[in-house]
């Protein structure tokens, strides 16, 4: 089962779990929604901080809750089956900004650190029930979002000096980490 939806719209991430046996067993959720807007902390409008928190924490929380409800419902329905349900996997994309202080990144750093806290709580609560929860914290990935934040040449070159490899991550490099965490051997 594969789907895309607006992570901030509760109604779009609350699937009907009345008959899970009619659908494929849910096994993987990747929380990829992200938002960044750079500004000095003393002038960051409260609305910008809320947009960071809403997109980077609340959205993944809504999606993860919906996934867990669907997984647990399908798992219960599969109890009478001879084969055990596949393990559930939740992988959230955080950021190295959750681990390091970055200029003009106050709201972003806080939101990505919060996502790691959420992920740890999900791992603690849902791990014993069959769902692992992990986060990946890449450096800047050269996506549309990364280009928006770091597209200016002088800013980009200054930041690259602080990255040991001297380059931003490619989306496929981040994806490789996510794929590994979704494999059975990562349980």
Residue spans for each PLM region:
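Substrate-binding pocket helix/loop in short-chain dehydrogenase/reductase
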Residues: 26, 40-51, 159
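Conserved NAD(P)H cofactor-binding loop of Rossmann-fold oxidoreductase domains
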Residues: 32-37
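Active-site loop immediately N-terminal to the catalytic Tyr-X3-Lys motif
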Residues: 41-42, 100-106, 128, 166
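Active-site helix of classical SDR
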Residues: 64, 111, 119
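Alpha-helical segment proximal to the catalytic Tyr-Lys
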Residues: 69, 124-125
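Residue(s) in the substrate-gating loop at a strand-loop-helix junction
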Residues: 95
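C-terminal substrate-recognition "lid" of short-chain dehydrogenase/reductases
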Residues: 167-187
């Amino acid at each position: 089962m594969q789907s895309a939806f607006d992570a901030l719209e509760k109604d779009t991430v609350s699937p009907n779990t009345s008959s899970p046996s009619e659908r494929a067993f849910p096994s993987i959720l990747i929380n990829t929604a992200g938002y960044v807007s750079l500004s000095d902390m003393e002038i960051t409008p409260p609305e910008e901080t809320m947009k960071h928190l809403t997109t980077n924490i609340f959205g993944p929380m809504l999606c993860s809750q919906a996934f867990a409800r669907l997984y647990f419902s399908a798992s219960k329905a599969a109890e009478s089956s001879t084969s055990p349900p596949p393990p559930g996997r939740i992988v959230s994309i955080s950021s190295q900004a959750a681990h390091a202080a970055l200029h003009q990144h106050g709201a972003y750093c806080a939101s990505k650190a919060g996502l790691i806290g959420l992920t740890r709580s999900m791992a603690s609560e849902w791990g014993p029930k069959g769902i692992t929860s992990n986060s990946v914290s890449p450096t800047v990935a050269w996506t549309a979002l990364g280009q928006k934040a770091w597209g200016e040449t002088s800013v980009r070159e200054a930041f690259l000096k602080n990255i040991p490899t001297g380059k931003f991550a490619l989306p496929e490099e981040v994806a490789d980490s996510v794929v590994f965490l979704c494999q059975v051997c990562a349980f």
